[in-house]
Amino acid sequence: MIKIAPSILAVDLINLKDEVKLVDANGAEYIHIDVMDGHYVPNITFGSNIVKSLRPITNKVLDVHLMISPVEKYINNFIEAGADIISFHPEADDKPFEIIKNIKNKNCKAGIAIHPNIKVAEIAKFLELIDLVIVMTVVPGAGGQKFMDSEVSKIIELKNIRDQQKLNFEIEIDGGVNKETSQICKNSGADVLVAGSYIFSGNKDNYKTLIDSLR
């Protein structure tokens, strides 16, 4: 079954812990944490302290997406805070292979995120080393954007590579995921769907229904 990763980018931060507990109790497998530095992307969001504060309240996968540059100097902070998966944009640092090795050597899963401007061929060299590929279906930097249909071909391409080479990475979709676009992603080969506004702008009593509607 496809996994759902509610994105706390869309949460009212005053109620962050309560909201995470709610989606945890209502079927989410991952909690997605978007980290933005105001440099790689124009927005600024969370640091490793948010991961540290969430770790004691959920045993679900803390799925950290770093939209920062440079990357390497901050990796250990997120590992020590309790991240289960750390994904980054390889073009944002000049040592992507070392970063992947560092993450995995510390019993954390490593992922690569693909900006809409980046082709699958440009990150293919990492695929045998990583646990997750995030296909960005919006331009990184803000929540609530419209799903980019042009990126669906990347999902299909990644699934074909995985099948042909017998690799083990998950394919995660991040951006504009709702009831309709989730089916496109699922049918194209996605394993994990990140959803922020679709879930957290709804009624708290309906979180289970909203999460289940994405499967």
Language model segments and positions:
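N-terminal active-site wall of soluble small-molecule enzyme domains
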Residues: V35-N102
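Conserved, mostly hydrophobic/aromatic
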Residues: L16, V23, D34, F78, ...
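Glycine-rich phosphate-binding active-site loops on the catalytic face of alpha/beta enzymes
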Residues: I86-D94, I134-K146, S188-L210
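Glycine/Thr-rich beta-alpha phosphate-binding loop at enzyme active sites
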Residues: D37-T45, N49, P116, A124-F126, ...
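Alpha-helix-loop-beta-strand connector modules within alpha/beta enzyme cores
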Residues: I44-V64, N102-G111, E151-I171, G175, ...
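Hydrophobic faces of well-ordered beta-strands that scaffold small-molecule active sites
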Residues: K3-S7, I31-I33, L54, L62-L66, ...
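Structural motif
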Residues: N26, I57, A81, K106, ...
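Catalytic cores of alpha/beta
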Residues: E19-V20, E72-E80, I118-I130, G175-L193
